[in-house]
A protein has these predicted regions:
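Viral virion structural and adsorption modules
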Residues: 1-7
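Beta-sheet-rich sandwich/jelly-roll-like modules and their strand-loop junctions
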Residues: 7-73, 78, 129-149
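Short linear sequence elements within intrinsically disordered, low-complexity coil regions
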Residues: 11, 20-22, 93-95, 109, ...
Length: 149
């Protein structure tokens, strides 16, 4: 992956999340260490402070795209959904790239789709969840691209 004007992906660490059969739920993506079910952890502990600099997502499956509504996502720390979160939204039909069949991808950096770089501290648990459903989703993969201080 190359660089953009604002984000040098070669200097970033990536943290992977996924969820199968999301449906219309507002649920956490999981760390897929042998699956992505409820028993899997839903966050990565951060070894030092830093910032989420970018997000890449892949949505796939027969229900994708399902509507022309925005799907709203929330990056949060330590399971707290009420304060100190970063939300962004996109429409699968108009904002994502259809790479093949029912596979749609997007890369979001600072200033796009309502996203601003998101700061965290050492020891924080970094999580992502869909906070508002724009319709049914099948499979979602997400990478949070992080730069440590």
């Amino acid at each position: 992956m190359g660089s953009t004007e604002f984000t040098d992906f070669n200097k970033l660490q990536k943290f992977y999340y996924a969820r199968q059969d999301m449906g219309t739920g507002t649920v956490d993506l999981r760390i897929p260490n042998g699956g992505d079910g409820e028993a899997n952890l839903n966050g990565h502990p951060m070894p030092t402070s830093g910032k989420v600099k970018a997000i890449t997502m892949l949505c796939s499956g027969p229900d994708t795209p399902s509507t022309s509504n925005d799907h709203t996502w929330m990056i949060r720390k330590n399971g707290n959904s009420s304060s100190n979160t970063e939300t962004f939204a996109f429409d699968i039909d108009t904002d994502m790239t259809n790479t093949n069949g029912t596979n749609y991808t997007i890369t979001i950096v600072d200033g796009q789709h309502g996203f601003s770089e998101y700061s965290f501290n050492a020891g924080d648990l970094l999580q992502i969840r869909r906070s508002s459903s724009g319709g049914t989703l099948d499979n979602v993969n997400c990478v949070l691209w992080v730069m440590f201080d």
